[in-house]
């Protein structure tokens, strides 16, 4: 499935995660704003197919591994609509986002985190060139409990297709 990435519009919000619910795990949600697409800050992009249909979205925020600006890198996430899953869309989208970061920013590393039970995302990240680094214990609150996850990364110097 050929895909492309584009900035959000207000029309996209109801189609994306949580768009149909005013609540999340913590209670009532704040009014959703259209996320920005600036690669140097927190942001997101919509994943679309050839005819412009929304397949899902990518988001990112920066994490810091040291005190200077050179020690920060984006942590990315992906969400796919059910009909887009299992078709290689997530792999293509995450690889495309990594390429954008390495072409347009000076980051050395892009990270991703996924639940230990999310085998599909683990496979997707591996196919996109990410390396598994280890378990992050009790890192994500979901479904009423803290859950373990796996941390993945890809470096600027890692081979990519």
Locate each region found by the language model:
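Acyl-donor (CoA/ACP) binding surface of acyl/acetyltransferases
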Residues: 1-23, 44, 48-161
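Active-site rim helix/loop that mediates acceptor-substrate recognition in acyltransferases
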Residues: 24-50
